[in-house]
């Protein structure tokens, strides 16, 4: 504990089974300034008996929040061999970078439209080694959102997702399709594009 809402921590896990062992070491910290700025970061690595060397990871974000503007940036990365044997990792072998911004407008006292906001979020995801090789991102996600808060407790939210997903060939290395003449490797498609809106209206409580 560094005082206030600031902290610094250490994580160490150890799992062994016979001659096999998995160890994870990480540092994490949290810093908040003036209730406006915040930085959170974690970095570490895993070491596993049947894998040469260590496998690094990181997860970090920086955010700012004011009455009219807020936003942030975040990044995470997990080496293909990173293995938290006593924990859970939703998806490894990936690097993600994201950024978001929100602009809030306030109506005059007694106005029908009390508050409105517009936000955008952009995220890119790479295969871990591809990121360091300078490859294009496999997945790109862009999310613009409009929100309107009206007098009396009515709320209108308009969310749109615009996404493109690349083909992760390593996921299908051993996946084959049966044909009339035998089996063929699954090839997939280069990219899948997805777009859609979601509109929600909340009535007064």
Region roles according to the model:
Residues 42-205:
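Exposed, low-structure sequence patches enriched in small/polar residues
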Residues 1-48, 110, 115-122, 200-205:
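Surface-exposed extracellular loop regions of Gram-negative outer-membrane beta-barrel proteins
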């Amino acid at each position: 504990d560094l005082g206030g809402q600031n902290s610094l921590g250490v994580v160490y896990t150890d799992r062994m089974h016979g001659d096999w062992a998995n160890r994870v070491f990480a540092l994490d910290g949290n810093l908040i300034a003036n209730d406006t700025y915040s930085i959170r970061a974690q970095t570490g690595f895993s070491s596993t008996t049947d894998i040469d060397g260590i496998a690094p990871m990181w997860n970090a974000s920086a955010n700012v929040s004011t009455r009219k503007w807020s936003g942030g940036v975040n990044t995470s990365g997990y080496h293909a061999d990173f293995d938290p044997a006593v924990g859970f990792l939703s998806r490894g072998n990936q690097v993600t970078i994201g950024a978001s911004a929100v602009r809030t407008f306030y109506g005059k006292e007694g106005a029908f439209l009390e508050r409105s906001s517009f936000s955008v979020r952009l995220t890119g995801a790479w295969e871990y080694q591809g990121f360091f090789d300078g490859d294009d991102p496999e997945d790109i996600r862009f999310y613009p959102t409009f929100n309107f808060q009206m007098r009396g407790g009515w709320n209108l939210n308009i969310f749109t997702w615009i996404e493109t997903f690349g083909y992760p060939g390593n996921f299908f290395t051993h996946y084959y399709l049966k044909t009339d003449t035998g089996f063929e490797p699954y090839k997939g498609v280069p990219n899948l594009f997805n777009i859609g809106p979601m509109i929600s209206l909340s009535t007064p409580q």
